[in-house]
Structure formats: structure tokens, C-alpha cells
């Protein structure tokens, strides 16, 4: 991968990409952690919230081709990353304005714009670091991933302080996070224009060996896609409504205390990802991928029946820490020349499909059950029904063949 305006400022590049990851993953949790519970307080029903979350995921998927297009049009990856940060600033700003003006259509529009913003960072951040650090990118990628997990954990707390800390729900205070995203976006753009950027890359044509390997591996890739889609559907459905569940079912008022509890649950991935990576090196990729899926589902059911946040912590630890392990298994069982294509399929079809379907199914089921059991029990029933898919996903791992090679599991996604 070519580089232009190369500087020795590796630390600056790592700092900017890490801050970008922190902001991107943090903003992604403002939507289900802050915006959706506020909408629920405003008597927006589960079906509407589920559809809104599903459209957010769908738009994020449809916006994916905009990322390489933006890279080509601007002439660099970091410039595209800066534009993605500015998109986050715009989307969160529109949401804040919608709450201030009591215009729900602006809040909805902001959530959908956030879907576009969410498409940018992840395919760009690793490309920038891999280009700058080359074969020594492992540590940089790990630090970068840790900042993503940290942002995901801290933003619900920080946003709760801003929005709920004044004693009333004041959604307009989300403008602070819009401003931060814009400032970092501008900083990235200035740095990329003056010092360093990663040039666009031309894709290579597929070889005959590539086509032959594809024919042999297509069934396996399809199986891995189904496994991941089912698991991600459950995960997305639960993540969409977990904030509402804490508020309505566990009666945790929307306050700084609510944000602290949600942050604690989400922080589980900070220890979970290296722990699962370490365990998988000892007991095997497939087994750990299967067991972690069962563990996530079992702990979540225990959380539903007991209301204990300890069970929620461990459930989310296995939920949020499993994806790097799945990607490692894909890299192990698929021929080397197909790894990039296979991981792309798993990401774009399984993860995106799960995100779209999971929120939609959970929201519609919650709305359906609410007519019979009431709002609180309706949401509880919906989550218990959806989590069954996780057990199916866990069982399907027995059909995946033993990997012919063992690759190191990335500690942070």
C-alpha cells in the first residue's frame, strides 16, 4: 500500500486513529444507550424503535460502498476517516436539535444519518495503521482496539452525565458529543492534508486458483455466515433494547446511575476479548466460539430471571468479545487466498444481516407480546424468544471442520 507525505509521527497517527475509534464506537452506543430509552420515555413503541434500529443498520450496510468511493475521491484513507467523524458530528447534532425542538422526525433523521457515519471508521482505521506500521502493526492495532472498547464503555456514562445529570432529561446536551466528533474530524483532515495519508489501492483480479478454492469452500463459508448471522441477530436485538430494559424492567431511572451501570456492563469486553483469545489458544477456536455463544445466552437468561447485573456483565462479556474469535476461525478454516473474501462475506452479510433482522424481530415481538403481557413483560418475553437463536448458532459449530492451521486471535476488535 503506497503512502504519501510520510512523516515519522507514528504516535500522532496512532493517537488520531485511536481517538477516532473511541469516538466512533462511543457514538454507536449513544443510539441504543441514550436515544432509544429517551424515545421510549416519550411513549414511542417497541416496534417503531426496532424498525428505526433496523433501518440504521441497513443504511450503514448500504453506505459501505461510499467508504472506498470517498477514499478514491479524496485521495486518502485518513481524509475519508475525517469525513466519517464529521458525519458523526452532523448526525448527533441533528438528534440533539430534534430533542431541543421536540421534532421527532429530526431525531429519526439523525439516527439514520448515524448509520452512514458508522460505516466509515472500521474499514479505514486498520488500513491506516497497517500501512504506517507494516509488519509491526499488531501492538498498534491492539491499542487502537482497546480505545474502541473504552469508548463503547465510557460514552453511555458521559452522555448520561450530560443528558440526565441536570435532573431532567435534556437531550439537546448531546451537542457536546457532536462538537467533539467534528473537532477530531477536522484535526484528522488537517493532519492528512499536511503530513500523512494512505493512498487508495487497486484491487487485483481473481486467479484460477482463487476460483477453484472458492468452489470448494463456498458451503463452509455459507455455514459460517449462518452461524454468525443467527448470533448477531440475537446480540443486536438485545443491545438495541438493553437500555430500555434497565429503565423499564429493572426500574433504573434515566440518570447518571443508569449510565454508570450500562458502562459497567459494556466494560466487560475490555477484559473479555483478551480472555477469550487466551482461552481459545488453549482449548481451540471452534470450541471456544461455540461455548462463548452458549455462555452469552445462558448468562442473559439468568439476568432476565434474576435481574442481577452480575449476570448481565458476564453475558455481555461473551457477547461483545466473540467476534474477533469468529474472524480467527474464518481465517483458519478457509484457504488463505479466500480469507479476505470470506471475512468480507461474514461481515457484510452475516453481521449486517443480523443487525437488521435482530432489531426488527425483537421490536416487533416486544410490541406483539406487550398487547398481552404489558410493556415490561412484553419486552422480557421478546428477548427470551430471540435468545433461542443463540443456542442454535452455538450448536451449528459442530458442523465446522477442525481448522488445518492455528492463527493468533486478535485481542481487540
Give residue ranges: language-model regions.
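Extracytoplasmic gate region of multi-pass secondary transporters
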Residues: 31-32, 220-270, 358
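Cytoplasmic helix-loop-helix junction between adjacent transmembrane helices
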Residues: 110-148
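Helix-to-loop junctions at the C-terminal end of transmembrane segments
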Residues: 63-76, 272-284, 366
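C-terminal ends and interior cores of transmembrane alpha-helices
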Residues: 86-101, 294-307
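Helix-loop-helix hairpin linking two adjacent transmembrane segments in secondary transporters
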Residues: 135, 143-195
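C-terminal transmembrane helical hairpin of 12-TM major facilitator-type secondary transporters
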Residues: 285-329
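A membrane-interface helix-boundary motif in multi-pass transporters
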Residues: 163-180, 364-390
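A late C-terminal transmembrane helix in Major Facilitator Superfamily
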Residues: 336-371
Amino acid at each position: 500500500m503506497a503512502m504519501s507525505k510520510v512523516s515519522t509521527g507514528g504516535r500522532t497517527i496512532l493517537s488520531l486513529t485511536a481517538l477516532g475509534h473511541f469516538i466512533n464506537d462511543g457514538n454507536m452506543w449513544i443510539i441504543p444507550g441514550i436515544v432509544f430509552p429517551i424515545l421510549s420515555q416519550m411513549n414511542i413503541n417497541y416496534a417503531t424503535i426496532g424498525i428505526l434500529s433496523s433501518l440504521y443498520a441497513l443504511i450503514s450496510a448500504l453506505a459501505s460502498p461510499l467508504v472506498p468511493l470517498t477514499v478514491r475521491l479524496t485521495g486518502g484513507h485518513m481524509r475519508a476517516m475525517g469525513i466519517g467523524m464529521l458525519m458523526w458530528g452532523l448526525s448527533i447534532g441533528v438528534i440533539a436539535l430534534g430533542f431541543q425542538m421536540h421534532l421527532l422526525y429530526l431525531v429519526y433523521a439523525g439516527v439514520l444519518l448515524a448509520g452512514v457515519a458508522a460505516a466509515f471508521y472500521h474499514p479505514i482505521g486498520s488500513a491506516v495503521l497497517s500501512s504506517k506500521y507494516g509488519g509491526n502493526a499488531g501492538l498498534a492495532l491492539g491499542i487502537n482496539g482497546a480505545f474502541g472498547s473504552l469508548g463503547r464503555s465510557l460514552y453511555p456514562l458521559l452522555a448520561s452525565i450530560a443528558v440526565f445529570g441536570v435532573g431532567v432529561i435534556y437531550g439537546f446536551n448531546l451537542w457536546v458529543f457532536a462538537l467533539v466528533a467534528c473537532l477530531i474530524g477536522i484535526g484528522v483532515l488537517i493532519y492528512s492534508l499536511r503530513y500523512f495519508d494512505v493512498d487508495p489501492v487497486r484491487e487485483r483480479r481473481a486467479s484460477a486458483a482463487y476460483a477453484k478454492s472458492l468452489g470448494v469452500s463456498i458451503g463452509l463459508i455459507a455455514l459460517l455466515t449462518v452461524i454468525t448471522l443467527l448470533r448477531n441477530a440475537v446480540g443486536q436485538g438485545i443491545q438495541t433494547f438493553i437500555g430500555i430494559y434497565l429503565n423499564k424492567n429493572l426500574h433504573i431511572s434515566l440518570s447518571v446511575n443508569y449510565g454508570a451501570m450500562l458502562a459497567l456492563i459494556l466494560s466487560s469486553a475490555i477484559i473479555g476479548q483478551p480472555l477469550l483469545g487466551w482461552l481459545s489458544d488453549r482449548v481451540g477456536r471452534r470450541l471456544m466460539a461455540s461455548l462463548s455463544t452458549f455462555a452469552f445466552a445462558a448468562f442473559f437468561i439468568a439476568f432476565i430471571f434474576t435481574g442481577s447485573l452480575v449476570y448481565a456483565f458476564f453475558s455481555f462479556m461473551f457477547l461483545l468479545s466473540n467476534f474477533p474469535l469468529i474472524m480467527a476461525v474464518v481465517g483458519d478454516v478457509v484457504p488463505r487466498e479466500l480469507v479476505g473474501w470470506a471475512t468480507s462475506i461474514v461481515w457484510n452479510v452475516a453481521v449486517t444481516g443480523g443487525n437488521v433482522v435482530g432489531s426488527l424481530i425483537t421490536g416487533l415481538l416486544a410490541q406483539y407480546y406487550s398487547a398481552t403481557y404489558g410493556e415490561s413483560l412484553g419486552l422480557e418475553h421478546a428477548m427470551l424468544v430471540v435468545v433461542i437463536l443463540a443456542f442454535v448458532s452455538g450448536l451449528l459449530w459442530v458442523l465446522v471442520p477442525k481448522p488445518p492451521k492455528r492463527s493468533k486471535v486478535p485481542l481487540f476488535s
